[in-house]
Structures are given as C-alpha cells and as structure tokens.
C-alpha cells in the first residue's frame, strides 16, 4: 500500500477485491431448535443471543472488506487531490506568469506612448516659446512703425505751411502719401499677424495641455501597472477583491485606447507644424515690411533731396534776377533824374525864345515884320516844345518802367522768401525729422 506523502504519477494497480461500494446484506439466522439449544425448553421456538461462527466470520470479512474499500477510496481521492493541486498550482503559475508578461507588454506600450506624448509636449513647449518670441518681434515691429507714421504725418503737416505758389503736389508729397499708405497697410498686416499668432499660441497650449493630461493618465496607469507587475505570491499588500474581475462598461478597448492617443499626437503635431509655418511666415513678413519701409524712406529722402536742389536753384535764379532788377531800378532812377534835369534844362531856352517872341510882338507899325529872326524864334519855340513833350513822354515811360521794376522787385523778394520758407520746411524741418527714422533691425522687431 502506498505512503500518503508520495505523489502518484499513474493509476494504482487493481486490487484483489474490486474497489467498489458493497451493498449491505441482511442475513437471516435460523432458529436453533436442535438438541444443542442453550435455552432449554423454556426458549423452545426462539433464537438465542449468540451468533453462529459463520456469522462471525462473515462479519469479520465484511469489516475487512469495508476497511479496505474505504482506504482504497481515500487513497484514490488523495491521489486525485494531489494531482489536482499540482495541476492547479502549475496552471496558477502559468496564468500568473502570462498575466505578468501581458502587464509587462502593456507597460512597454504605455512607456512608448508616454515617451511620444512627452516628446510632443516638449516640442510644443519649445515651438510655442519660439512663436512667443516671434509675436514679441511683431509687437516691437508694430511699435517701431509708430515713429515713421509720426514722421510722415508731421512732414505732410509741415509742408501744408508752404506758401503759394510753392504749395504744390510735387514728387515729395506723392512719395510721402505713398509712405503713409504703406505704413498703414503694414500696421494692419502686423495686427492681423499678431492676432493669428495669439490664436496659434492658444491652440498650442490647448493641445499641450491635452497631451499633458493624456501623459498624466498614462503615468498614473503606468505606475499602477508597474506596481501590479511587482506583485507575487509573497506580497503582503494583496487581498481579496471578489468583484474586481468584472469589466467596466466605460472601459476602452486597445484599439480605441491607441487611437485616442494617436489623435492627440496627430492634432498636436498638426498644430506644431502650423506654428512652424506661421513662424516662417512671420520672418518673411517682418523682412519684407522692414525692407519696404526702408526703400520707401529712401525714395522720400531722395525726393526731398531733389526738391531741395530745385528750390535752391530757383532761389539762386530769383536772387540773380533780383540783383539785376535792383541794378536796373537804380539805373532807371538815374535815368528819370536825368530826364527831369533835361526837362528842367529846356525851360530856360524856352523862356528865352518865348520872351524874345513876346518882346518882338511889341514892335511898332511896319517894324512888326515876319523876318527870318521871327521865323527862327517860332521854330525854336516849336522845337523846344517838341523836345519837352518827348522828354516828358519818356519820363512817363521811365517812371512806369520804374514802377514795373519795383513790382518785379517785390515779387522777386516775395518769391525768394517763399522759396526760403519752403527750403526751411523741407530741409530743416522735414529732413531733420526724418533723420530719426528707425533702422532696419528696429523695423524687423529685433530691437
């Protein structure tokens, strides 16, 4: 018979007596009515209290058989129990190892997604910081345009103080109006770009927070699974949770779990690329706007330079004509004085001639003769009158010419003053103010 502490690996050999439950059998004992009765005549017809020898043997055999059957059944049950315990132990070990392996694989998957989320968050943070720097460049560039706009507005207002006929729509004013329109357009463009950058920064932060929340959930789940992976049969912090094997209705599937994170990564990467494209666009915008402003500034300065040269040349010519006019006025004044003196000089000869004629008109009788002297005196008076008339007419012409020269002098002096005022406005007001125009680096938002 096998020992109880030995594990049987095969079925036991069949015994002599089959291992089955034997039915109990009732034996009818015959009444002892023979001569060997022990009860005498008083017990005639009744069984005695003693068993027969056969009954005794049969009873012993029945006890032997029952003991053997019970032992055999117990041994078989022990063998089956030991085998079942070994099988369940092996199964438990296999399932636990498989569960641990599955949890480990899950840890690897979560670590991979967690790393991707962390990388995406870091890239989004880095990209958002770069975009914030570009936004600050836009704001500095927008602030830098306030100076040029103030300059061009002041130039236009200053040039409105020019006097006629210099108050003209010249090339300088055309370039200034172009510059003012360009600055307004650039300011509107920069404002729109700043709004776009602010919106993109907000989207970047939103997707960063979404990835951070997903990353945080995965870190928490990773820590839970990592703790679960360390559990073993010797752990002291394990206990029974009868209802833990029930699946939650809100639980996700591996496909939806992976798709959930993939969507977050895809959207975050899409916004990151949009942010990169926006940064490149901002670079191009700032470079183009700063170059356009400087080119237009140079065009305005060139127009101012040409206009100042034109005004300077016109003033020099006016001053030259003024000098000639002044000389001519002086000469004309001397001429008028000479004419007046000539007229005055003709008065004495005319008086003499007229006095002679007058005195000779008092000659008596026949002496009042139209002699040659009389004719010569008459012609002398006529000649003197003609000379005086010519001199007076020439004097009137000279005086009118002098008045015209004076008017011309006044006009020239006024024009020279106007040109001087225009030069002062353009050169000392406008161009001096334009010397404070921002640099390209300031217009590009670097300073």
From Swiss-Prot:
The keyword Ubl conjugation applies. Residues 72-104 are annotated as: Disordered. It is found in: Cytoplasm, Cytoskeleton, Cilium axoneme; Cytoplasm, Cytoskeleton, Flagellum axoneme. GO terms for cellular component: axonemal A tubule inner sheath; axonemal microtubule; microtubule cytoskeleton; sperm flagellum; sperm midpiece; sperm principal piece. Residues 82-97 have a biased composition (Low complexity). The keyword Cytoplasm applies. Keywords: Cell projection, Cilium, Cilium biogenesis/degradation, Coiled coil, Cytoplasm, Cytoskeleton, Flagellum, Ubl conjugation. Residues 72-81 have a biased composition (Basic and acidic residues). Expressed in trachea multiciliated cells. Ubiquitinated, leading to its degradation. Deubiquitinated by USP16, promoting its stability. It holds the Pfam family Tektin. Residues 69-144, 304-423 form a coiled coil. One of its GO terms (biological process) is regulation of brood size. It comes from the Eukaryota. Belongs to the tektin family. Microtubule inner protein (MIP) part of the dynein-decorated doublet microtubules (DMTs) in cilia and flagellar axoneme. Forms filamentous polymers in the walls of ciliary and flagellar microtubules. Contributes to normal sperm motility. Microtubule inner protein component of sperm flagellar doublet microtubules. This is Tektin-4.
